[in-house]
Amino acid sequence: MELQLAIDLLNKEEAAKLAQKVEEYVDIVEIGTPIVINEGLPAVQHLNENINNAKVLADLKIMDAADYEVSQAVKYGADIVTILGVAEDASIKAAVEEAHKHGKALLVDMIAVQNLEQRAKELDEMGADYIAVHTGYDLQAEGKSPLDSLRTVKSVIKNSKVAVAGGIKPDTIKDIVAEDPDLVIVGGGIANADDPVEAAKQCRVAIEGK
């Protein structure tokens, strides 16, 4: 089981500093969509140049022109790139092919997918490396959790890894870990904590079952 830190609301310099502080506890560091919108792919490059061991994920949430956008993210140092599960099959397949051509991985974000079970099966067959159930900010505000979606997707896929994101914090991560996902994505639960290093450590301890 891997742990990913999602950084959304900082600039690229702040993001790199946070990543450096917690890198020993996380496997992947994400440059979130808001940072990409504000600062572009150089933010991905800046992170890549300032951390040592963790992989870098570029949360582009690709919808179209998938092979080109994946290639650009990879050029700037991304190890993993995201595409939306609601994208066309042709886009998903092109993104998978482009990522794999460079030895990189594709994460498919299931945010706003209506038929999770059917789409997860299709994406699994298309070669997605990760399928991520994602309760976004707007649904978190309504009290929604990704647990049920995680169970649904885990029950139907055969090859892809399952990731889970959405409001996960050190005090709630054990419920997620109990469902045995392959990747747990924590954003504000670490980034906005009074002590991000301690929060990251608590999350690492939880996923290692200690």
Curated annotation (Swiss-Prot):
GO terms for biological process: 'de novo' pyrimidine nucleobase biosynthetic process; formaldehyde assimilation via ribulose monophosphate cycle; L-ascorbic acid catabolic process; one-carbon metabolic process. CDD domains: KGPDC_HPS. Pfam families: OMPdecase. The keyword Repressor does not apply. InterPro entries: 3-hexulose-6-phosphate_synth, Aldolase_TIM, HPS/KGPDC, OMPdeCOase_dom, RibuloseP-bd_barrel. It catalyses: D-ribulose 5-phosphate + formaldehyde = D-arabino-hex-3-ulose 6-phosphate. GO terms for molecular function: 3-dehydro-L-gulonate-6-phosphate decarboxylase activity; hexulose-6-phosphate synthase activity; orotidine-5'-phosphate decarboxylase activity. Keywords: Carbohydrate metabolism, Lyase, One-carbon metabolism. Its EC number is 4.1.2.43. Pathway: One-carbon metabolism; formaldehyde assimilation via RuMP pathway; D-fructose 6-phosphate from D-ribulose 5-phosphate and formaldehyde: step 1/2. It comes from the Bacteria. The keyword Lyase applies. It is an enzyme of class 4 (lyase). Belongs to the HPS/KGPDC family. HPS subfamily. Catalyzes the condensation of ribulose 5-phosphate with formaldehyde to form 3-hexulose 6-phosphate. This is 3-hexulose-6-phosphate synthase.
